[in-house]
Amino acid sequence: HTLTGINGSSQQRFEQFDLNVAVTRLNLFGISADNANLHIARLRNDWEATISSADINGKIAIPDDLENGTVTLNFDRLKIISNQSGEDNSRIDPGKIPRLHMVIDDFSTNDLNLGKMIVKTTKIKNGISIDTIRFMKPDLQISGAGHWRKEDGIDDSQFNLDLRANDLAAMLETFGYSKAAIEEGETSMNLAARWFGTPMDFSLGNVNGTLNLDIKKGQFLNLQPTAGRLFGLLSLQTLPRRLALDFSDLFDKGFSFDQINGNFTLEDGNAYTNNLFMRGPSADIIVSGRTGIQSHDYDQIVTITPQVSRSLPVASDLFGPVGV
């Protein structure tokens, strides 16, 4: 069965309306669910739909005047599987999407759980403006804004996103990199990106824009012993760790760093940088060149500057003056 006609004239025809139905397949405002229980009721000047299934649990309030009103979604949980309906995202016209206000306590897309989600949109010419988009977990926060337009049949999406994570390893695990050889690392990122496609078509391999990165105090894991570790052992910057008998950054965990930062230009499936900088207790490392996001290849120059000047005073104390 198909329910239609929820518009301005429906108020006169449905002063009282209450319907419970079990559906094998539900698609409502782009949200799909299998084997869902749907309750539709008339409340004052709104329609209220309550949805319950394995992947969705919550309520949608739909105003009579979709052109000027706001559709409100309050969900306990929502899990979206890409292309689960087999529909082509390019067939969606963002200019026909009503104003939205969404609050979802537990949001997942595919196997990616992003915690609580808040989205607020307004209508613009040929599309929608995403005025607010936020994802919140205890160790990860993402916030930003953007827009989605369709002109002459071509989708155009543009977003600016800020990401904050208390632990880089936990963030990478959230995004599916559970075997990332890194630990700790307070992370800040800013992504300004544009791509031809819908917001659901986003991937780093198909966007143009910029990515700014800053990571503080982390460790690369499972590195083999190298001469660089000796400088790390002797570095003045890590002397407080040594006095506390803390050698975990050298032996137990791998190679530690104090800061990593850099700026990338994203273009045609590649990321370009001339200032990716890592400062560690044993060396400064600068990387410039290209990373192939889609082709998984590299064309880079890596410059390593050992922290000899910072390490020699400690070395002198331990091994005697130079030349002795």
Write out the residue ranges for each language-model feature.
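N-terminal leader/targeting segments and the immediate start of mature chains
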Residues: 2-14, 89-94
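Small-residue helix/turn framework positions
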Residues: 16-29, 39, 48-57, 63-113, ...
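A short, compositionally biased
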Residues: 43-45
